[in-house]
Regions:
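Short, solvent-exposed secondary-structure boundary motifs
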Residues: 8-12, 52-58, 64-72
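Compositionally biased amphipathic helical and low-complexity segments enriched in hydrophobic
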Residues: 6, 13, 31, 56, ...
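Short beta-strand-centered aromatic/proline hotspots
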Residues: 3, 9-10, 16-33
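Acidic, low-complexity, intrinsically disordered interaction modules
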Residues: 23, 27-43, 62-95
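Intrinsically disordered, low-complexity, charged/polar segments
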Residues: 36-62, 95-105, 114
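Short intrinsically disordered terminal tails
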Residues: 1-5, 108-114
């Protein structure tokens, strides 16, 4: 996961979502409300599983004519066996992977209300 992350990606730390503030080989730092930036260990952060609830928080719209299919600003995702995949068979398992894919596709950050 370390090499998948970008600044502003969301991860779990202490079972709470935080955004990555900076990245180095030794450690990442997180943006926190309590004390600004916080340095943590790589082993202490984990990906946030991508769920239907999160897709709604990303302004996703469930497509009524498909089972488990969402549209997030023109990107169509289908829930298949515990992961989401884009219409071109790209497996997306976590929020940070979707953030990166969205940025690559749309050239802008994904809006999320966590």
């Amino acid at each position: 996961m370390k090499h998948e992350l970008r600044i502003n990606n969301y991860v779990l730390y202490d079972n709470r979502p935080f955004q990555i503030a900076s990245i180095s080989d030794e450690y990442p730092s997180l943006k926190t409300i309590e004390f600004g930036f916080g340095v943590v260990e790589w082993n202490d952060i984990s990906p946030i599983p991508l769920t239907e609830e999160l897709l709604v928080k990303c302004k996703g719209v469930k497509l009524a004519h498909y089972i488990n299919c969402y549209n997030v600003n023109g990107i169509q995702l289908i829930l298949r066996g515990g992961w989401f995949e884009y219409v071109h068979d790209i497996h997306i398992k976590s929020l940070h992977q979707f953030q990166n894919f969205y940025f690559f596709t749309k050239q802008q950050e994904l809006t999320i209300e966590l």
